[in-house]
Amino acid sequence: SYPQSQVQLAEQVGAYLLENTERRLTVAELAQRFGASATLINSSFRGVYGMSPAAFLRAQKMHGAARLLRQTDRTVLDIAGQFGYDNGSKFAKAFRDVIGVSPNAYRSGIDCDSCAPEAPAV
């Protein structure tokens, strides 16, 4: 169990990450924003959410992108750009790593039993 102050820090960082999914945030930037060391942010966040802030942010981005792929006709590259990816292949790799299939396969409605069902909650 983590001290309440560390839980609160992790929750504040998580909320901030959710509000800034379109940005590329580093742990150093989070440390500066929250007045804590990068080590404290990483350990607190990992203790509460079971993953690093970077992995959490990536999961949030990919699940947001997955929703847009299914609900809009926007291009994969356009959606990638909304979430801070200017390189389609890097976006596709991140999407595949998190969701389990390529963006195009996901959009086409492939049977996705092994796909990650939802983003980690804050």
What are these regions (language model features)?
Residues 4-8:
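Short helix-capping and inter-helix turn/linker motifs at the boundaries of alpha-helical repeat units
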Residues 11-19, 24-29, 47-86, 108-122:
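Terminal helix-turn-helix DNA-binding modules in bacterial transcription factors
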Residues 29-36:
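Long, charge-rich low-complexity segments
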Residues 33, 82-83, 98:
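Residues within the alpha-helical elements of helix-turn-helix
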Residues 37-38, 86-87:
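Short coil turns linking two alpha-helices in DNA-binding domains
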Residues 40-41, 45, 90-91, 95:
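Short hydrophobic/aromatic patch on the recognition helix
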